[in-house]
Structure formats: structure tokens, C-alpha cells
């Protein structure tokens, strides 16, 4: 198995997903409540070790016009921090991923406002799935 971790970086939580490059499927995992940078990095390093991977995909929240604002800068800084613990980081444009995650929860009969951790990890799954889909050999965007 060639595991990859997907992360949706947020102020209160980090959404988590794990996927497999061979099957090209991503699955949401429980979100991490943010504590402090050192603790967050430790927990992500533990997850990466448990999954046997050093590859992490981080959502990059671009503005609708494609530009990068403060949230994108924070995601890039987070990615740089992940790099300091030996993880290889890729970024994926995550415009509308949180909205889509909320829509998916509603379709599943869940209330997004009561399932914020689920929503964060559902967004991480969408981010990671986008990355996996782009790596398909028959995809011209890959």
C-alpha cells in the first residue's frame, strides 16, 4: 500500500483523511483538535508513521479569483512546518471543499453545524481525492 495523508488546515481543527495511491481512494478520519504547533506536528508525525507514509497533501484555500490570501499563507506556513518533521508536502486548491463537504453531510442526513469535525475531515477527504484523481495516468492534468 502506498498511503497518503490529506489535511484540511483550520484554526480550531485539522481535518484528516488517508488514501491509497494504488486504489486511488481516500477516507475521512477523525479530525484533530488544534492544541499548539508542536503537539499538532507530533500527532501528524505519529499518524504518518502509523500509515507508513511521508507524503501529505494540504488543502490550499485560494480566493475565488485564484489569488492567495491570508488563509493560503497560513496553509503554506503549515506545510513548511510539516516539512521540518520530514514530511513531503503537496498542496491542492481547496476552493469550495468545505462547502461540498457540508453538502455531502446534508445528503447523508447529518447536520454540518453539529458535525464540524466530520465536516473538516470530509473536506480533507475531498482534497486528498482530488490529488489522487489528478495522479491517474490517463488524466491530462496529472
Description of each model-found segment:
Residues 2-7, 11-142:
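Phosphate- and other anionic-substrate recognition elements at nucleic-acid/protein interfaces
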